[in-house]
Swiss-Prot record:
Keywords: Cytoplasm, GTP-binding, Initiation factor, Nucleotide-binding, Protein biosynthesis. The keyword Metal-binding does not apply. It comes from Wigglesworthia glossinidia brevipalpis. NCBIfam families: IF-2 (TIGR00487), small_GTP (TIGR00231). SUPFAM superfamilies: Initiation factor IF2/eIF5b, domain 3, P-loop containing nucleoside triphosphate hydrolases, Putative DNA-binding domain, Translation proteins. It is found in: Cytoplasm. Signal peptide: none annotated. This is Translation initiation factor IF-2. GO terms for cellular component: cytosol. One of the essential components for the initiation of protein synthesis. Protects formylmethionyl-tRNA from spontaneous hydrolysis and promotes its binding to the 30S ribosomal subunits. Also involved in the hydrolysis of GTP during the formation of the 70S ribosomal complex. The gene is infB. Residues 396-399 are annotated as: G3. Residues 341-508 form the tr-type G domain.
Length: 841
């Protein structure tokens, strides 16, 4: 390519000469107005422009913030402070001509290179044409040789071979050049397309920016308030720029997907439909086909769920719901340690006021009986005593009839039962109950006849009565030990302890003293400042402070432990009662407690048990509702007394609720709508007000704030410390709520003589009193031909146009009967009076 002058080059790329010389100077080439520009210099200039090209911002924005506060008066009269922040933006647009000039220079240089490439292509075309002409000449020359006479055969062959070789070489060259030419053309086309696209995109973006800038300028005319909303415009434009096309990769399944469904012992219809990825109404319709009616939220059995899933073409895997529980039990390191002798667990049972707690006080050298309210034991207690011959654990049970469940619980966890019988009172109902509990539990019994130091005592009578109830003493050839004791003086108590230890030796009581502990909850309560406190009896292993335990529906890490003497301990072995702190809630008395390695597993099992308990309660309530639908329709007149019961311990609340339910009769039903452990709270008050219930507290006190609220509502709260008081209070409520029964008594007889009609009163019967008296507002029974016609109230009684309250026999009167005008002459009217009967509970 020939050298070009700077003037012609500047005209070609459309840039002033001065600026072009400056660009060359920046690139390191000194040029004047007269100098020429070579191809190499052009390349250097182009590379410099490409390397030093910087995208400058099109707009320069200056943001200004002004903050202020406004005092606004509200409806209440108080002033409100509102913070205001005004944001102003000012834009300075760069000269667009400068930005475009750089691009024009670049584009012009690219065009020159494109021209150069086109010239090169033209050259190659000429070269191809020349090669074609050469080939044609060679072919013509060959034809001439063939036409001429053959002089020398050898020369002719050589010339032919040479010609063939030349033709092949030329053909290969032509093919190679043609391919090269095609590739160059394609590349040029692609480059052109890409450049055109970029130019178009830049042009569109510029137009958009110019439009936005114009809008902002126009908004400035309306003042600074409009600038507050400019941020939103900028955000919207940015969002529009970032829009990208999304393509989903989901393919609709052509075949039915067969799933493997895990089904537990119970599953709801909604859960089953989710597992099968089917709409729940389809599952319900399939169940209807099988003749099973159910709703979406209803829980179905494992067998029904399996049949439905298999019918819908899915595989079923049956699992046990208590699989995790079984795994926890397996993980316990049982049978790894040696069995050693343990202390016997002795439960003391008997009738009320027969001296059970007094006996324990003498053994333990304490005064528990004096501190007990009402002089009776109302909660189960566990203590261990160190004697000269060994340790004995005693469980004290209440003797009242209401505490049957506590006695059953005591008989289940015990090794020996000591039945205390008062020598002056003989065998009573709870004594018989204790004997029956011992027989059911198959536990050996020791009879302790107490109060032998009294003058009225008769131990022989007690011994004879025991035979009637199947207890055969050693004196009469049986195997039951009988001892005469006095809890006050201590007479015979040492012999009783010896008898207990002897019986323990015969039983050969053994347990593991190491490993993961397990036991039973004797009692649980809620204490202020401590939270849930549980009294447990360890039966196996060793319990340490910090162990994770699972107890029924509750779990937790043991924070602290204390023995029956209120001393803090770090660990405890078998047959020793202990109080523990740290459970998540109050466990149910009688629940099994086990040590678990992982807290996560303990929590999972506890949640599963809670859900199972909730489901079972819902099922029971549903059955009760269905069974009582028709009975409630017939017995709509039956009254309900709703009670909210709160007690200090779980066992006490259970016993009291059972005792109160037994007070229900034909007219009144006792409903324990809620029973819990702990003080009376605001939620209890809210529940009682909504259900019109009585709040009963046993050994608990309500908050004073709640009492103030209840006074205004008129809510009834009764706090007692003795079970007798609660029973008497509820009995009184039943007596007051009972419907009074009346007996109808005939006090007078009338005979209708004449009928008068008045527009206001209706039919007036003119009668004569044959017997007795007639009273106003009394009931009139109308008989016609000795058959009943109507019975209603007398609303008006007159004698000679005067209103009177009563009329005696032998006199005439006029009466008006309520809602009855079909009175006829010679009708007989009986006057009735209601007589109240005595109430009975």
């Amino acid at each position: 390519m020939k050298n070009v002058t700077i003037k012609s080059f500047s005209e070609e790329i459309k840039i002033p000469i001065n600026k072009l010389i400056q660009k060359f100077a920046d690139a390191g080439i000194t040029k004047t107005n007269i100098d020429y520009v070579s191809l190499e210099e052009k390349k250097i200039l182009l590379s410099y422009i490409n390397s030093h090209h910087v995208n400058l911002p099109k707009n320069l924005s200056l943001q200004k913030k002004t903050k202020s506060k406004l005092n606004i008066s509200s409806l209440n009269g108080k002033n409100k402070i509102v913070k205001i922040e005004v944001r102003k933006k000012k834009y300075l647009k760069c000269d667009s001509s400068l930005l475009f000039k750089d691009k024009i220079v670049k584009n012009n240089i690219d065009k020159t290179f494109c021209k150069k490439n086109i010239k090169d292509l033209n050259k190659t075309k000429k070269y191809v044409e020349l090669s074609k002409n050469i080939n044609e000449r060679e072919i013509n020359f060959e034809k001439k040789l063939i036409k001429e006479p053959i002089l020398d055969k050898s020369k002719l062959k050589i010339s032919k071979n040479l010609i063939k070789k030349n033709v092949k070489i030329n053909k290969n060259l032509n093919i190679y050049k043609k391919n090269e030419f095609k590739q160059n053309l394609k590349k040029n086309k692609l480059n052109k397309k890409e450049k055109n696209k970029k130019i178009e995109i830049n042009y569109k973006v510029k137009n958009k920016n110019e439009n936005i800038f114009k809008k902002i300028k126009s908004n400035r005319l309306f003042g600074s308030e409009t600038n507050f909303f400019n941020n939103n415009i900028d955000k919207k434009t940015n969002i529009r720029k970032k829009i990208s096309s999304l393509t989903h990769t989901f393919n609709k399944p052509l075949k039915k997907i067969i799933k493997e469904i895990t089904i537990g012992e119970t599953i709801s219809v909604f859960e089953l439909s989710n597992k099968m990825a089917v709409k729940s109404h389809k599952v319900v319709s399939n169940m209807m086909k099988l003749g099973i009616k159910s709703s979406i939220n209803e829980v179905i059995d494992q067998d029904i769920a399996q049949i439905i899933a298999e019918e819908m073409g899915h595989k079923v895997k049956l699992i046990k719901n208590n699989a995790l529980e079984e795994e926890i039990i397996k993980n316990q390191n049982k049978n790894l340690y040696e069995l050693k002798n343990r202390a016997p667990v002795v439960t003391i049972m008997g009738h009320v006021d027969h001296g059970k707690t007094s006996l324990l006080d003498y053994i333990r050298t304490t005064k528990v009986a004096l501190k007990e309210k009402g002089g009776i034991t109302q909660c189960i207690g566990a203590y261990y005593v160190k004697t000269k011959k060994g340790i004995i654990t005693f469980i004290d049970t209440p003797g009242h009839a209401a505490f049957t469940e506590m006695r059953i619980r005591g008989s289940k966890i015990t090794d020996i039962i000591v039945i205390v019988i008062a020598a002056d009172d003989s065998i009573m109902p709870q004594t018989v109950e204790a004997i029956n509990h011992a027989k059911i539990a198959k536990v050996p019994v020791i009879i302790a006849i107490n109060k032998i130091d009294k003058i009225t005592s008769n131990p022989e009578k007690v011994k004879k009565e025991l035979i009637k109830h199947g207890i055969f003493l050693e004196e009469y050839g049986g195997d039951t030990q009988c001892l005469l004791i006095s809890a006050k003086s201590g007479l015979g108590i040492d012999f009783l302890l010896d008898a207990i230890l002897l019986q323990a030796e015969i039983l050969e009581l053994k347990a593991m003293h190491k490993g993961m502990a397990s036991g039973t909850v004797i009692e649980s309560r809620l204490e202020k400042g401590k939270g849930p406190v549980s009294t447990i009896l360890i039966q196996e292993g060793r319990l340490h402070q910090g162990d994770v335990v699972l107890c029924g529906c509750e779990y937790g890490k043991i924070k602290a432990m204390q023995d029956s003497f209120k001393c803090k301990i770090k660990s405890v072995g078998p047959s020793i009662p202990v109080e523990i702190l740290g459970l998540s809630g109050i466990p149910i008395s009688g629940d099994k407690i086990t040590v678990v390695k992982e807290e996560k597993k303990a929590r999972e099992v506890a949640i599963y048990r809670q859900n199972k308990l909730r489901e079972s309660k819902l099922r029971i309530n549903k059955k009760i509702k269905i069974e009582n639908v028709f009975s409630n329709l017939n017995l709509s007149t039956k009254k309900n007394i709703n009670i909210v019961l709160k007690s200090d311990a779980h066992g006490s609340s259970q016993a009291i609720s059972n005792a109160l339910i037994l007070l229900s009769n034909e007219e009144i039903k006792i409903n324990i709508i809620y029973s819990g452990v702990g003080p009376i709270t605001e939620t209890d008050v809210a529940l009682a007000t909504s259900s019109n219930a009585i709040i009963i507290g046993f050994n608990v006190k309500p908050d004073f704030s709640n009492i103030k609220n209840t006074e205004s509502i008129g809510l009834n709260i009764k706090c007692c410390s003795i079970i007798y008081e609660i029973v008497d209070f509820v009995k009184q409520k039943i007596y007051l709520s009972c419907n009074t029964k009346y007996n109808k008594k005939i006090i007078g007889i009338l005979i209708v003589k004449n009928i008068f009609q008045l527009p206001k009163l209706g039919s007036i019967a003119g009668c004569i009193v044959k017997e007795g008296i007639v009273k106003k507002n009394s009931i009139a029974k109308i008989l016609r031909n000795k058959s009943f016609v109507h019975e209603s109230k007398i609303i008006s009684l007159r004698r000679f146009k005067e209103d009177v309250n009563e009329v005696k026999s032998g006199t005439e009167c006029g009466i008006v009967i309520k809602n009855f005008n079909d009175i006829k002459p010679l009708d007989i009217i009986e006057i009735l009076e209601l007589e109240e009967l005595n109430k009975k509970i």
